[in-house]
Amino acid sequence: MTIQDRAHLYNNSDFGQQFPDSRFMVSDRWISATWITGNNYKSLSSRSEDDKPFYGSYPPGWLKRMWTMFPDAKRILHLFSGSLSAADAKPPHAHEFALRLDIRAELKPDIVCDAENFAASVKAYAPFDLMPSDPPYSVEDAEHYSTALCNKRKVLDQCHQTLRKGGLLLWMDQSIPMYSKKHWKWVGSISMYRSTNHRIRGVMFFEKV
């Protein structure tokens, strides 16, 4: 399935029909869209003890929209999964597994591991079809998580080792990570807006070459 096919899946989905301004623009080179998810202060990853949003978690509705584009994804790895629950990590379609990886054991991910060196820890599950990834964007963000800011070049190298050829890395960030054109093809982007006083995030679609 091409990236253009995936854009058309979203455009023809309930989300694309209900929110026509969110549909992808499609060209031979890539796809692009703007998504405004609205004023919902409860993020998908939330602390069960007090129901307050977990700092930096996925924007509301992000995964539900994203799943419409990947009905064929069987092996999924959520990098920097935070407090994403096992139930929310799973797509609505038939799949083999949807694993959560995070360095913080207290958040109870499926795999406790440093994202800069995770390839060996997921060897039994690789290669993956899809990797949604939401890393800390800055030193300040990393301090909120009580972790060090990751080396994004090293993380992308680990992703390249464990994705199948043609597999997709969905990298959510406030800047474009350094990447090698020998290893990755940048095939799409989404500009993500929530509401006032929320940061703007981008989602970069990188296809493994």
Go through each PLM region and give its residues.
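S-adenosyl-L-methionine
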Residues: 1-93, 198-200
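A short glycine-rich, Lys/Arg-flanked "PGG" loop and its adjoining helix->strand segment in the class I
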Residues: 146-165
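Class I SAM-dependent methyltransferase SAM/SAH-binding core
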Residues: 81-117
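A short helix->loop->beta-strand "cap" motif at the edges of active sites that frequently abuts
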Residues: 94-96, 163-167
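A short acidic, Gly/Pro-enriched loop at the edge of an enzyme's catalytic core
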Residues: 113-133
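Conserved beta-strand signature within the Rossmann-like core of class I S-adenosyl-L-methionine
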Residues: 166-174
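A short SAM/SAH-binding and catalytic strip from SAM-dependent methyltransferases
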Residues: 129-149
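Class I S-adenosyl-L-methionine
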Residues: 174-209
